[in-house]
Amino acid sequence: MNRTRSASMVQGGLNWDSLPLKLFAGGNAKFWNPADIDFSRDRADWERLTDDERSYATRLCAEFIAGEESVTQDIQPFMAAMRAEGRLGDEMYLTQFAFEEAKHVQVFRMWLDAVGVTDDLHHFLDDVPSYRTIFYEELPDCLNALTIDPSPAAQVRASVTYNHMVEGMLALTGYFGWHKICVERGILPGMQELVRRIGDDERRHMAWGTFTCRRHVAADDANWGVFETRMNELMPLGLRLIEEGFALYDPMPFDLSVDEFMAYASDKGMRRFGTIASARGRPLAEIDLDYTPVQLEDTFADEDARALAAV
């Protein structure tokens, strides 16, 4: 495809108040380097854990690092879809998005190396078939479909799978798990810093996904049905993944509660419906400047911070 114009040179320039470029600026302002995180104390804490505690923590980390690798690879077709749509601001943000996902792979691998976990970890995923279904089938299928069909409906399905299920439900629940393990016990300070850093990045990622779904729903109400259907397909699968992980341990390491995790994940999934639904019937031009998606993720972060402070 030949290039005929440059969006950055049109009259008026770029709209820096549009949500994608706000997210882009936010990512630049909050840049962090994985090499700056101090993992030196984590090794001693790690060695004091029981075998089952180390097993569960390794499993959780394996699920995270494999997931971060998957999304690093699978976001590429969304960039091409934004280019085809002529949305330079979104394309700029997604380049940063992909870079951050690659950085998350780096930092989880650095932590594993720091605590001495260097064995092959694939077997940790064999016992949770729902994980493989989501990350090895549903995610790449939905994202790769954009190379053939970058339509709004296909974008909504891809965003639900990536931003609302993988990030907005499963990753948030995983961070919750790390907080329960680390913060409540005052251990693994490097992991605590790691989770804080990637959580901040992921809030921007989820906000972009919510924004993308909202603008397509505002443009065509039929896309609300696409969003609703895809969420209803994936939420049971995500909850089953959590159940499968808990079923492997008796008693559960760190005194974690499957009911608490299921309730947390369900809450994060269900509350996304209202934010997307609020775009129905709205003028499309308003959506680009509506920061509701950012506010939702900030609300989740504030709730988690208050809950941890109360421990």
Curated annotation (Swiss-Prot):
Keywords: Iron, Manganese, Metal-binding, Oxidoreductase. It is an enzyme of class 1 (oxidoreductase). Its EC number is 1.-.-.-. Its cofactor is Fe cation; Mn(2+). GO terms for molecular function: metal ion binding; oxidoreductase activity. GO terms for biological process: deoxyribonucleotide biosynthetic process. Fe cation binds at E101, E167, E202, H205. There is a cross-link at V71-Y162 (3-(O4'-tyrosyl)-valine (Val-Tyr)). Gene3D superfamilies: Ribonucleotide Reductase, subunit A (1.10.620.20). SUPFAM superfamilies: Ferritin-like (SSF47240). The keyword Oxidoreductase applies. It holds the Pfam family Ribonuc_red_sm. Binds 1 Fe cation per subunit. Binds 1 manganese ion per subunit. The iron and manganese ions form a dinuclear manganese-iron cluster. Mn(2+) binds at E68, E101, H104. Homodimer. Belongs to the ribonucleoside diphosphate reductase small chain family. R2-like ligand binding oxidase subfamily. Probable oxidase that might be involved in lipid metabolism. This is R2-like ligand binding oxidase.
